[in-house]
């Protein structure tokens, strides 16, 4: 019996149990009372609408389930950012569905709500996927309006994207199933087709109370902007539905008539499960992020038939590169090796660290994948680039810059999985969020930060100690230990996968066994968008 394997397995399964528990809580939205209120109005919830709309026999993945987690407690919270975003299939067509959750502050927009909607549109644009908006929102959450209204990546960007997607020929369908007010009223009208549900859907720039205050006119909301008004008088909407299900049925019929998209042509054959048991990942992945392990053991439990054709196997060993398949799709894998390795020259290299040779290898491999039009999968467990005089004299900065250049300029779809550490410039070199991965997800074990908690706490402690000394105060060993523990606790909270997911630094926190489905759905989505730009590394320092 392998005691370490069993210890790891128990720890990881317990962490995943916590993940499922937190997901269940998030999916309750604004709570049972608000859900009952919706039902009493004859309306379905956001999640019920999506469940009814999507094909039951096809997979689906949810984007940003933890968005807003712990960010707005003073305002009563904002589960899932008050909007549910799912990539799934409607009438056999892969698409993005965005549904306002009216159980959360009547679907009002928090700052993170805008960010999540923009992420949904970004996914649709990058992959040329149809996008369906299920609208039921009271508009901007006024107490936080200064954080959502005027800036480039705020609320207004959504309508800019509406216009841009329309010009790109990306199908947009909007269904108004509740309130659609103020600036939000433009969204359905800027879509290709707009449906509205009779008696529950309404669209207006200003509601009846504001109209009364502004111009003295007395009018009720239904007459002002209900389904009959907009389908028979203003011509703003195209179809009137009797209820939520009737509207969603019409969307399904519309989606069924869409032409098939032109494909990028990424290679796919019949899918096969890994020969090695994927469940063993739980025992391989260490409890502590500082412990070494062989990343190849993880890869062989993720790829079809457990076949990984390694590129430059004996060179630059702290990064693994090679070709494989996931659910039949060809992929090029770039992964951090976490065990200590020994070079042919006898040099010992730390796992999870990027050295000059591994940076060179990864750069060349990324170029090869662009040449062959093979999507890239980055498996992150990186603590950064190697430091010290030997590395500096050897040109680690220019070698790292080449890798960052290759990642930034890559034109094939990129996908990132944060398995463990994702620290500092290593995050950039391994295709962090700033480098436009089509999807970026974290396992429960992922940590995203400038550096590890212990190291950061030591640096911050030194700064705090120096500040106290300037004031003439001295730290006793006991106070120093207490201050260190306090700083580390704060920092550890900020590097947790939940902190990152709440801010949409990642699209989701997933069970390792869900990785294959996420990558496969991501590549299938990317296959709808032919590559239009040539791969060009630009100027590099050799």
Please provide the spans of the model-predicted regions:
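Ligand-binding clefts of soluble mixed alpha/beta catalytic domains
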Residues: 1-542
């Amino acid at each position: 019996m392998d005691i370490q394997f069993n210890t790891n397995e128990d720890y990881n399964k317990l962490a995943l149990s916590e993940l499922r528990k937190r997901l269940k809580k998030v999916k309750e939205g604004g709570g049972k009372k608000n859900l009952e209120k919706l039902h009493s109005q004859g309306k379905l919830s956001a999640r019920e609408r999506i469940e009814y709309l999507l094909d039951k026999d096809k997979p689906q993945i949810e984007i940003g389930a933890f968005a807003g987690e712990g960010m707005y407690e003073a305002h009563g919270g904002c589960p899932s950012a008050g909007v549910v975003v799912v990539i799934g299939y409607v009438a056999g067509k892969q698409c993005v569905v965005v549904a306002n959750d009216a159980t959360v502050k009547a679907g009002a927009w928090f700052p993170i709500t805008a960010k999540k909607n923009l992420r949904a549109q970004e996914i649709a644009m990058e992959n040329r996927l149809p996008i369906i908006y299920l609208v039921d929102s009271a508009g901007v959450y006024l107490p936080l309006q200064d954080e959502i209204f005027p800036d480039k990546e705020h609320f207004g960007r959504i309508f800019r994207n509406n216009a841009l997607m329309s010009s790109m020929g990306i199908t947009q369908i909007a269904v108004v199933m509740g309130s659609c007010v103020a600036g939000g009223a433009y969204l359905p009208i800027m879509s290709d087709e707009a449906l509205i549900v009779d008696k529950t859907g309404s669209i207006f720039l200003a509601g009846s109370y504001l109209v009364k205050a502004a111009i003295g006119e007395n009018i009720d909301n239904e007459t002002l902007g209900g389904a009959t008004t907009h389908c028979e008088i203003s011509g703003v909407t195209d179809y009137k539905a009797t209820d939520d299900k009737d509207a969603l049925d019409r969307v399904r019929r519309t989606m069924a008539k869409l032409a098939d998209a032109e494909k990028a042509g990424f290679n796919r054959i019949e899918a096969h499960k890994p020969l090695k048991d994927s469940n063993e990942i739980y025992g391989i992945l260490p409890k502590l992020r500082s412990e070494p392990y062989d990343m190849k053991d993880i890869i062989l439990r993720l790829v079809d038939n457990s076949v990984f054709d390694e590129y430059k196997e004996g060179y630059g060993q702290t990064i693994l590169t090679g070709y494989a398949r996931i659910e039949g799709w060809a992929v090029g894998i770039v992964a951090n090796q976490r065990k200590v390795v020994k070079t042919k020259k006898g040099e010992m290299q730390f796992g999870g660290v990027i050295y000059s040779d591994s940076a060179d290898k990864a750069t060349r491999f990324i170029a090869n994948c662009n040449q062959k039009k093979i999507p890239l999968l980055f498996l992150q467990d990186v603590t950064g680039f190697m430091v010290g005089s030997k590395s500096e004299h050897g040109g680690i900065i220019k070698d790292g810059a080449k890798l960052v250049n290759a990642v930034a300029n890559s034109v094939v779809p990129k996908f990132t999985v944060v398995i463990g550490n994702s620290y500092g410039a290593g995050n950039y070199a391994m295709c962090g969020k700033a480098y436009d991965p089509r999807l970026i997800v974290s396992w429960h074990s992922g940590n995203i930060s400038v550096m590890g908690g212990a190291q950061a706490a030591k640096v911050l402690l030194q700064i705090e100690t120096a500040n106290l000394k300037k004031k003439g105060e001295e730290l006793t060993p006991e106070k120093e230990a207490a201050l260190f523990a306090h700083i580390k606790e704060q920092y550890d909270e900020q590097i947790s996968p939940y902190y990152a997911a709440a801010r949409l630094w990642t699209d989701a926190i997933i069970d390792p066994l869900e990785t294959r489905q996420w990558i496969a759905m991501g590549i299938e989505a990317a296959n709808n968008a032919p590559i239009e730009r040539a791969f060009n590394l630009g100027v590099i320092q050799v």
